[in-house]
């Protein structure tokens, strides 16, 4: 491991649901914690308890019963900068235990991130944390690097947003990027709703976290939704039980695949959007005819919401149905795809050829925050 080397770069992937942070050159992030800031709902009565006015990450998660939880990143885009600063502070000082002023820092951003946001990230890094150098990379591009490719189309689906990003020779093609505001958090909400129909009530932000756990442990994508519904109706072979924190055991049946089916049929939650298979196809069709073949053959999945068992087979089936019949279609779903953005960042930041790409403190002082548009693309 490489903490001793004072110039090791830091890699911080700020997701809507989880922050993944660690050192460039490592093969996995050192710290993975929820992107949440919690504030007490009640006035503290225990004097001398050292109660804080805010909690971040796992600590907020463990005290969730008495806190109001807020996510500063919505749909992949930072919306609350004060809370975001708290999260970064927690990342550097409590999780990684490093002094940010000693390490170049690679941050990630959502595709089509507003320009003002990139500038604000740059400004906070240099002015609040005094980093010596920094870089902002697009999440989907890093996932592609992590799979060992420079051309392909990435389906990146996390907690807050889903994107289809076609990439050719390392460059994202912005005109063909598709954004779908439907991701893990919406699936959790939908599961809360359909479990309520079974008579189980989940309402608070704390209970939502329980449902998220049920979703991650028990949900899967059906290859054929109608068939699966019929099977679920006629037998109990698909039923699974889950023990709640208070010891009560609940049973869940067709909810297991009805929940992630929303990715393919957003109308389940009242959205008019196309499903992820259609957005992938539409994104490919917006690209130059000459590169489509390469994109069809390199469909890379990344992000936690692509972790459902069965999703790759279903995707293969759906895209095959949409694409020209002779087209070779390949879905790449690496087992570590939950962290592939971070892994790609770790690879990128440790390449010798990348070292001249960093925005240095000196360049920032000369040009100001807008330097990020010139150096990071």
From Swiss-Prot:
Q: State the Gene3D superfamilies in the record.
A: 3.30.420.40, Actin, Chain A, domain 4
Q: What is its main location?
A: cytoplasm
Keyword Acetylation carried by entry: yes
Q: What is the E.C. number?
A: 3.6.4.-
Q: What is the effect of changing residue 165 to M?
A: In CMYO2A; results in sequestration of sarcomeric and Z line proteins into intranuclear aggregates; there is some evidence of muscle regeneration suggesting a compensatory effect
Q: Where is this region: Interaction with alpha-actinin?
A: 112-125, 360-372
Q: Which residues carry this modification: N6-malonyllysine?
A: 63
N-acetylcysteine PTM positions read: 2
PTM annotation, UniProt: Oxidation of Met-46 and Met-49 by MICALs (MICAL1, MICAL2 or MICAL3) to form methionine sulfoxide promotes actin filament depolymerization. MICAL1 and MICAL2 produce the (R)-S-oxide form. The (R)-S-oxide form is reverted by MSRB1 and MSRB2, which promotes actin repolymerization. Monomethylation at Lys-86 (K84me1) regulates actin-myosin interaction and actomyosin-dependent processes. Demethylation by ALKBH4 is required for maintaining actomyosin dynamics supporting normal cleavage furrow ingression during cytokinesis and cell migration.
Q: What's any GO biological process attached to this entry?
A: positive regulation of gene expression
Gene Ontology cellular component list: actin cytoskeleton; actin filament; blood microparticle; cell body; cytosol; extracellular exosome; extracellular space; filopodium
Cross-link for Isoglutamyl lysine isopeptide (Lys-Glu) (interchain with E-272), residue positions: 52
What does the UniProt entry list as the effect of changing residue 3 to Y? In CMYO2A; some patients have core lesions on muscle biopsy
Cross-link named Isoglutamyl lysine isopeptide (Glu-Lys) (interchain with K-52), sites: 272
Q: Which Pfam families match?
A: Actin
Q: What chemistry does it catalyse, as a reaction equation?
A: ATP + H2O = ADP + phosphate + H(+)
Per its UniProt entry, what is the enzyme's top EC class, as one word? hydrolase
What family does the database annotate? Belongs to the actin family.
Indicate the disease this protein is implicated in: Congenital myopathy 2A, typical, autosomal dominant: A muscular disorder characterized by generalized muscle weakness, delayed motor milestones, hypotonia, and muscle fiber abnormalities on histologic examination. Histologic findings include abnormal thread- or rod-like structures (nemaline rods), intranuclear rods, clumped filaments, cores, or fiber-type disproportion. The spectrum of clinical phenotypes ranges from severe neonatal presentations to onset of a milder disorder in childhood.
Q: What else is known?
A: In vertebrates 3 main groups of actin isoforms, alpha, beta and gamma have been identified. The alpha actins are found in muscle tissues and are a major constituent of the contractile apparatus. The beta and gamma actins coexist in most cell types as components of the cytoskeleton and as mediators of internal cell motility.
Q: What does this protein do?
A: Actins are highly conserved proteins that are involved in various types of cell motility and are ubiquitously expressed in all eukaryotic cells.
Q: How does it assemble?
A: Polymerization of globular actin (G-actin) leads to a structural filament (F-actin) in the form of a two-stranded helix. Each actin can bind to 4 others. Interacts with alpha-actinin. Identified in a complex composed of ACTA1, COBL, GSN AND TMSB4X. Interacts with TTID. Interacts (via its C-terminus) with USP25; the interaction occurs for all USP25 isoforms but is strongest for isoform USP25m in muscle differentiating cells.
Annotated protein name in UniProt: Actin, alpha skeletal muscle
Organism of provenance? Homo sapiens
The organism that produces this protein has a lineage beginning with: Eukaryota, Metazoa, Chordata, Craniata, Vertebrata
Gene name?
Answer: ACTA1
């Amino acid at each position: 491991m490489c903490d001793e080397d004072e110039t090791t770069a830091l890699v911080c992937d700020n997701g809507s649901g989880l922050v993944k942070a660690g050192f460039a050159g490592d093969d996995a992030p050192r710290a993975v914690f929820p992107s949440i800031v919690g504030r007490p709902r009640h006035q503290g009565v225990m004097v001398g308890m050292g109660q804080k006015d805010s909690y971040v990450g796992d600590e907020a998660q463990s005290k969730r019963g008495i806190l109001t939880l807020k996510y500063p990143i919505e749909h992949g885009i930072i919306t609350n900068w004060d809370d975001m600063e708290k999260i970064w502070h927690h990342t550097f000082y409590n999780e990684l235990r490093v002094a940010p002023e000693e390490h170049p820092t690679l941050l990630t951003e959502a595709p089509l991130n507003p320009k003002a946001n990139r500038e604000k990230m740059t400004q906070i890094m240099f002015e609040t944390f005094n980093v010596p150098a920094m870089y902002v990379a697009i999440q989907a591009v890093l996932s592609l690097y992590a799979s060992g490719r420079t051309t392909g189309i990435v389906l990146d689906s996390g907690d807050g947003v889903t994107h289809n990003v076609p990439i050719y020779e390392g460059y994202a093609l912005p005109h063909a990027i598709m954004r779908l505001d439907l991701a893990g958090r919406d699936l959790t909400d939908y599961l809360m709703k359909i479990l309520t129909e079974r008579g189980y009530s989940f309402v608070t932000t704390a209970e939502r976290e329980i449902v998220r756990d049920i979703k991650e442990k028990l949900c899967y994508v059906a290859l054929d939704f109608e068939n699966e519904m019929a099977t679920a109706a006629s037998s109990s072979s698909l039923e699974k039980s889950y023990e709640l924190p208070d010891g009560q055991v609940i049973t869940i049946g067709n909810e297991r695949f009805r929940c992630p089916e929303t990715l393919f049929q957003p109308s389940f939650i009242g959205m008019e959007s196309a499903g992820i298979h259609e957005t992938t196809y539409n994104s490919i069709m917006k690209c130059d005819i000459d590169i489509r073949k390469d994109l069809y053959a390199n469909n890379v999945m990344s992000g936690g919401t692509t972790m459902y068992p069965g999703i790759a087979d279903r995707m293969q089936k759906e895209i095959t149905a949409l694409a020209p019949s002779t087209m070779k279609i390949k879905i790449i779903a690496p087992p570590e795809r939950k962290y592939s953005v971070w892994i790609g960042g770790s690879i990128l930041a440790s390449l010798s050829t990348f070292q001249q790409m960093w925005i240095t403190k000196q360049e920032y002082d000369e040009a100001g925050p807008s330097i990020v548009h010139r150096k990071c693309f």
